[in-house]
Amino acid sequence: MKLIAESGSTRTEWALVEDNHLVQRVFTEGLNPFFQTRREISRSVRLGLPESFFKKKLDQVYYYGAGCSSYEKKNILGASLVAQFKTPIQVESDLLAAARGLFKCEAGIACILGTGSNSCFYDGKIIVKNVKAAGYILGDEGSGAVLGKLFLADLLKGLAPKELANEFHEKFRISVNDVMESVYNFPFPNRFLGTIAYFLGDYMDNEYVYNLLTNNLRSFFNRNVCQYDYINYPIRFVGS
């Protein structure tokens, strides 16, 4: 039996597979070694998964996750998972999982648009080129976190439409100070920012929201996709 996991910054999907058949699927909170220590990741995995997962006789655990592009970060995740499952672990980036799922053995440009964003050129076997995602502060164009950041920045400066601002305050029931605390002092500000995207999704017919979303996506293409050979290769997307 194998355990396969795919994780973004917000959610992790775990699948127990035996003889190419799905046995059980479970969702837990997202894991990211850029924002969590080894101990925090271990605790999240232990508390999030059913106890039965740790009693299974597993041949291998395959983990594809956000923030796992470097050897150092892969080691953090790998050590956390080995401590819990006591079985061989293979850790790769969520971008490789996306590329394999989107293209299988075909070459193309794979893109992730979720809480964060990422992209790569995949040659049908491996990732050949990757424009750095750079995170929600320095990059992540097109992502939910950046969309939320752009809206909140306008909201705090009085630039968001009044009706939309009122709707936001009525739905979220948070003050300006609460927003600042969530972004600068609380854990996982990227998750908080990403939730704002769901709110904005209900107002797609609003010209301000439409332009905000369009400009965010355009930025993703201009700063990421355009650095690949997008004229000669297909572009495909996954994400929330």
List where the protein language model places each region:
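Phosphate-binding/catalytic loop of phosphoryl-transfer enzymes
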Residues: 68-163
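Short hydrophobic interaction/assembly module
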Residues: 55-74
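Glycine-rich beta-strand-to-loop/alpha-helix junction loops that act as flexible
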Residues: 64-69, 113-116, 232-240
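ATP-binding/phosphotransfer module of carbohydrate and carboxylate kinases, centering on a glycine-rich
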Residues: 1-61, 80, 102-107, 152-240
